[in-house]
UniProtKB/Swiss-Prot annotation:
Disulfide bonds listed in the record: none
Organism expressing this protein natively: Bacillus pumilus (strain SAFR-032)
Principal place of residence: membrane
EC number(s) reported in the record: 3.1.-.-
This protein's name: Ribonuclease Y
Length: 520
């Protein structure tokens, strides 16, 4: 290639490069200008948004300040209003105090006037009495002049007779008032002692029944208990003296008998036989004998546990065992051992309040029904049997007298005997302590109402509170107030003579007179 051509080509390439560079530079410049323009617009937009945000923030701050100012203003107004209300209340209070003081001054002035009037009347009365005394002195002088011819002893006797006649009525009135005050104080103190004792003593009672239930693993066991031709059940009934009732009750056998110790022996023996699975006459005899020993041990443990619980020590071992037998005795559904424990606690608490020997009172209370443990085995009442047992085991004379007198068979010779009788009545008569059969209960209620309605003038009677109170409505035109009291006493006496009941029965006679008119 010639140099000239090379030069031309170089020039052309340079020109092309210049043109291309120009256009490239122009394009870059335009792009930068466009980017700068966009950036400027973005900055403007951002500035506008920031300005708008600042504006809103300023408005919110202004609103918050306005709200805060308003709240503070309302609070201040409220406080001022409350302060004004308090000032008004204080003024009203002062005004009321002034009114009360004014009223008090008026009352005081009225009282002073009454006292002045009373003093004037008293002064007048004193003057009248002085006049009467002067008259009496003159009369006495005249009487002395009349009897001056008598001896000294005769004159003294005449004066004493006159004084006795004048003061006999006053002495009788004062004696009656003193007796009433003494009775009121004694009643108040007795109620206080009883309430304190009852509050500090709490005992639970379990109502016993005449049946026990033995659960079986399955009904097939019933056939094994009966045995071939009934020999097993006959053996068990013969050895324990308890009837076995096998009926449709699922998986259960009922033991029926009135001797709780025998029934418990049969229950334990039957439980052992069911668990062992071997049921035949020889095994039954073995289990019954073992159950008797267990029941005897349990009775002894119950006696020892009871003496420990009550805090009575030094009892004869045989007496402790007899005491444990009370666990299986009931009276009107009340467990006798629980009843004896409650009586012991009540008697001890009341003895402490009266300053008597609390331990001796507990001992007497615990043993007061000891005769019930064997009264079905020995002839005589439980009181007589209890006295014999206490005497046999050399108990304290106070304990023996407490047993003998707690039902009124003998006179109590000590305060402790009286406390035991009171504790026995409290434990037996409190609501829920004793129960009776439904038939006897209904019969007793009907008898109460029949006795009450048998008197002339009785309109209707109601036995309420489970038979512990009877209310008698009488005709007011047939019976007056005095006759109502006499009627209550007569009904009370008939109830005591004709009915047997635990605790006491309150007799209330209600006489009501109504006068009705209609305004038209």
């Amino acid at each position: 290639m010639s140099p000239t051509m090379f030069t031309i080509i170089s020039i052309l390439l340079s020109l092309i490069c210049l043109v291309v560079g120009y256009f490239v530079r122009k394009t870059i410049a335009e792009a930068k200008i466009s980017g700068a323009r966009n950036m400027a617009e973005q900055i403007v937009e951002d500035a506008k948004r920031d300005a708008e945000a600042l504006k809103k923030e300023a408005l919110l701050e202004a609103k918050d300040e306005i709200h805060s100012f308003r709240v503070e203003a309302e609070q201040e107004v409220r406080e001022r209003r409350n302060e004004l209300q308090r000032q008004e209340n204080r003024l009203l209070q002062k005004e009321e105090n002034l009114d009360r003081k004014d009223e008090s001054l008026d009352k005081r002035e009225s009282l002073l006037e009454k006292r002045d009037h009373s003093l004037n009347e008293r002064q007048q009365h004193i003057e009248e009495m002085e006049s009467k005394v002067d008259d009496m002195i003159r009369l006495q002088k005249a009487e002395l002049e009349r009897i001056s011819s008598l001896t000294r002893d005769e004159a003294k006797q005449i004066i004493l007779d006159q004084v006795e006649n004048e003061l006999s009525h006053d002495i009788a009135v004062m004696t009656k008032e003193s007796e009433n005050r003494a009775k009121e104080e004694a009643d108040k103190k007795a109620k206080n002692i009883l309430s304190l004792a009852l509050q500090r003593c709490a005992a639970d009672h379990v109502a016993e029944t005449t049946v026990s239930v033995v659960n079986l693993p399955n009904d097939e066991m019933k056939g094994r208990i009966i045995g071939r031709e009934g020999r097993n059940i006959r053996t068990l009934e013969t050895l324990t003296g308890i009837d076995l009732i096998i009926d449709d009750t699922p998986e259960a056998v009922i033991l029926s008998g009135f001797d709780p110790i025998r029934r418990e022996t049969a229950r334990i023996a039957l439980d052992k036989l069911v668990q062992d699975g071997r049921i035949h006459p020889a095994r039954i005899e073995e289990m019954v004998e073992k159950s008797r020993r267990e029941v005897d041990d349990y009775i002894r443990e119950m006696g020892e546990q009871t003496t420990f619980e009550v805090g009575v020590h030094g009892l004869h071992p045989d007496l402790i065992k007899i005491l444990g037998r009370l666990k299986f005795r009931t009276s009107y559904g009340q467990n006798v051992l629980k009843h004896s424990i409650e009586v012991a606690h009540l008697a001890g608490l009341m003895a402490s309040e009266l300053g008597e020997d609390a331990k001796l009172a507990k001992r007497a209370g615990l043993l007061h029904d000891i005769g019930k443990a064997i009264d079905h085995e020995v002839e005589g009442s439980h009181v007589e049997i209890g006295v014999e047992l206490a005497t046999k085991y050399k108990e304290h004379p106070v304990v023996i007298n407490s047993i003998a007198s707690h039902h009124g068979d003998q006179e109590p010779t000590s305060i402790i005997a009286v406390l035991v009788a009171a504790a026995d009545a409290l434990s037996a008569a409190r609501p829920g302590a004793r129960s009776e059969t439904l038939e006897n209960y209904i019969r007793r209620l009907e008898k109460l109402e029949d006795i009450s309605e048998s008197y002339e003038g009785v309109e209707k009677s109601f036995a309420i509170q489970a038979g512990r109170e009877v209310r008698i409505m009488v005709k007011p035109d047939s019976i007056n107030d005095l006759e109502a009291h006499r009627l209550a006493r007569d009904i009370r006496k008939r109830i005591e003579d004709e009915l047997d009941y635990p605790g006491h029965i309150k007799v209330t006679v209600i006489r009501e007179t109504r006068a009705v008119e209609y305004a038209k």
